[in-house]
Structures are given as structure tokens and as C-alpha cells.
Amino acid sequence: MSLKLNRRTFLRGVGAALPLPYLHLMEASAKTTNGGKPPVRFMTLFKPNGVHPPSWNINGGTEFDFRMSPLMRPFAHHKQDLLILDNMGDFGFSSHANSTRRFLSGHHQNTKSPSVDQLIADKIGQDTPHRSLELTTEGLFTNQIGCSYISYDKNGDPVPRESDPQLIFDRLFRNPLSHPAKRREMASLLDAVNDDAKSLARKAGREDQEILDEYLTVVRQTEQRLENLKNAPNAGIDFSKLKRPGRAANLNEQVETMLDLVALALWTDSTRCATYMLGNSNSRIIFDFLGIKEQHHYLSHFFRNNSRHNLDQLLKITLWHMEKFDYLLNRMKSYKDQHGTLLDHSLVMFGSGMGHSDNHTATRIPMILAGQGGGMIKTGRYLRYAENQQVGRLHLALMQKFGVDISSYADSDKPLPGLDGSPFKPYRERPFESWVKKAGGTITAQGRLRLSEDLNEAKIFYIDVAGKPSVRIEVAFRDFHDFNLAYHCGTAIKLTGSGVDRGGQLVITKVTELKSLFGRKPGTQNG
């Protein structure tokens, strides 16, 4: 008689229940229960506080022929598994709390309905031990509580998050009926299920034995890393004498452990839906393990707190975020699934709630989809849409692909096109005439506005004029904010202001009027 297992098979020991990854022994059961198709998982990874646009944005290139930006270099080797979306977001600029809500709720005013992850979890999370996981890196930011949540329930209320890897591990891989004192006495969860594992290994074929061995090794490594975190060298320290009491001893290892647990939970089908915040929007984390002494939020305002040193520190933090995205993709690629890798049959949504980290623009929001989603999307592409696209259109498209019966979401009633290779309207710059005029101390320039790519002049904008030196825009924060210069970047404008001629280059130092050539309006602040 042959041994048959289903996807809900566990290795069991006293006080422990360990879910299994896919084995060939399960194939007959899988064909019976889901038509032979592997389950598709949905994972979101949130990056706080936006980006430095010149370091993030892709300028030029086509759908299939494009060069990834400097901030994308940590995960550039995954290019063929990525769908990079550009011109995502609504008009104007936003508060930290509203931009955070937008990330998974389509619009900041969508406050009475579930977030997209919860709607997808309702569809795909009913057959797993855990309907969904909501994870974070930081505690609550009480000044603006909305900065701390991206997941919302059916009433529009925040879904509680978990930030402790040990509690997540217990929730996923320990029997909840086991007494906590007994749990702590276990040297290793694997010891508790060792006999069951050996018995299964004797009955399994060679390929399954290799997969099972790899799986148990991963669990053992993860548990050991959790133990290392718990035994961090701070036992005898008088915390009242520390400058920053309560600061995590090893943030990098904590985050990577959480990513290990997410990948493991998805791989074992413990859950099919997970969200993880790498920090609150308005994050006050100090990345001292990177040699940084200022809070992330302070550094994100690189215009008003401008210095080359501060910008370098911000970019170092942002690159760390990108490295964690890369870490997750590497983990998911390393795990075998029924018909490929875990990533092949997952859809990972990575991004932020705002674009320009200082001005909080709600345009050109960083947004990337990774994985094939079991054929839901076509990757290896860069889609820059002709006009700003509400994030709700993306959410609507994703929900429909996951089988959610929904025709509109937030303020969007049309799904975002192009994700699966279907036609979409790409960005094409309209023709315009560029020129510059100077009359006394007044300068008027018409052309494409851009933010300087020189990291030594992060506050400087330029208007490109055909056949002439670019006009330099060198203004105080008030003009930067009131005229929403960050919003108009990359578009054609006519700008008038007072300025001077510096050795043949015209420099505008005070803006008096700004007009979009094609009717782009920043709108009002979204809170």
C-alpha cells in the first residue's frame, strides 16, 4: 500500500506541530483537491518614507528594454521576475498616515472597507491554518496611528500586527495548546518531532528525502537564529543608562528572520497571504548598525535637512530596504514548489505609499510586482503609464486575478491594464517648444522640469531648454512646497520667477508662477 499525504499533513511531537512543504507523496492528493494546480500566494512588503526620486526613477527605455535605476541594483539580478510599475499614484501630495493607508486600500479616503490583502485572504486563506499574517518591524507610532498600519478589516479598522519573530514562530510552528513553560524547556522543536520525521523519511522516495532534509535544515537554522536574537549580548546592561532604551539589539537579523518566517509560512502552506512593514511610515528607526545616527524620518526630508552627508545616509537606508526585498526573493526562489519555485507561484507586491520622500508626493510611487503569480502576470517588463494611475486600479486588477468577485474598489472601477501583457497606454511625451527669456530680474523658462541627479545638489531643479544651458532652480523650501516642484518633475512647465545670470547660466531663486503646459494640477494636500 502506497503512502499518501495531503497538504495539511504535519510532523507532530509533544507540544509541537510542524507543517510540511510540498512532497511528491502529496501529488495524488493535490490533483484531487485543486485540480493539480499549486496554490498562489500573495505577499506585500512595505517600504516606509518614499525615495529620493532621481535615484529610484527609471528615465527612458521601453517596456522590455530598460535599465534599472541605482536604487534597484540590489535586486537587479531578478529583473526577469519583476514587473516594474511607473506613474502610480494620485494627484498632489500626502501625509504619512494617508500615504500608508493608500498602499493597500487604494485611496486614503477608503476608510470603511477592507484592505486588498484582507479581501484576497478571504478568497485564498480559508483552507490554511492561518488565514493571513500581518507583520511589522516597529511598534505603534502614536502621534499618527495611521502610520503604523497597512491592513484593515471589513469595518475599515486596523488589523493588529506582530513584530516579535519568536511569537510568530510559535504561532506558526508550535501547538498552541502546549504550556508556555514547557515550550521554553524544549531545546529544539525538531527534537520533539524527530521520530515522526525519521519514519516519514524511511517511507519517502529519494527526491522527497532530499526536500525533507532541506526543509528541516531551514527550520533548524531559523530556530537557531531566533535563539541568537533572544540571547543578544544585553543581559547584564542597566537599560536606564542607555541613550536609546528599548532599541532593538540586532535589527538586520530580526528583519531577515521575519522574512525567513514569511517564506517558510508560504512554502509550507501555513498561510497564503502575508503583509510585512519594514517600518512605519514616519519611521523613527535609527540604523546604527549601518553607522547612521539620525532617525530615518529626519533623513527622508532631504530637501529641508539638506546636506550631502544626510542624503548619503538616506540612500544607505533605502539600499538596505532594497536588499531586504532581494533577500525575500532569494528565499522564495530557493524553495521548490509543485511546478517550480515558491516565487513562481506567488505574487509579491513591494513599494511605498509616497514618491518624493521630502514633499510626500502621491505620484510616481515606487511599486513593483515580483513572481509569476502562477501565470497571473507577465514579468521582465517596465510599464510607465501615460497618466497617473490610481493605486486602487492596481488593487482591483490583483483582486480580480485572485478570483475576488469585485467590480470596483476605493475610487476605481476599472482594473489596471497591462499586468498580464494586455494592451495599455504607455507614457509618451507630448511635443512642446522650450525657451527662456530674461527681462531685468525676471526670468521665464519653458521646458521639462527635473531634479538634479548630482547628489551634491539634492535641492536643485533644472528646466531643460533646447540649444541653451539648462535654467537652474535654486529656491527655499517654501517655494519648493507651495509650487509642488517635486510633483511636476519630468513634465513640461512654464515657470516665472526672480533670478540672476551666473556666468551664462540663468538661476531662478524665487518662484512667482508655475503653469503646466498640459493641464497637470497638483490638487490639494491629501491630509
Enumerate the predicted regions with their spans.
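OB-fold/S1-family single-stranded nucleic acid-binding modules
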Residues: 502-523
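OB-fold (S1/OB) nucleic-acid-binding surfaces
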Residues: 457-475
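OB-fold and OB-like beta-barrel modules that bind single-stranded nucleic acids
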Residues: 444-449, 490-499
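Ligand-binding pockets and gating/stacking loops
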Residues: 1-430
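Short nucleic-acid-contacting surface segments enriched for D/E, G, S/T with interspersed K/R
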Residues: 480-494
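Short boundary/loop segments of OB/S1/cold-shock single-stranded nucleic-acid-binding domains
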Residues: 428-441
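N-terminal post-signal-peptidase region of extra-cytosolic proteins
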Residues: 66, 476-483
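Structural detector for short beta-strands of small beta-barrel domains
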Residues: 440-457
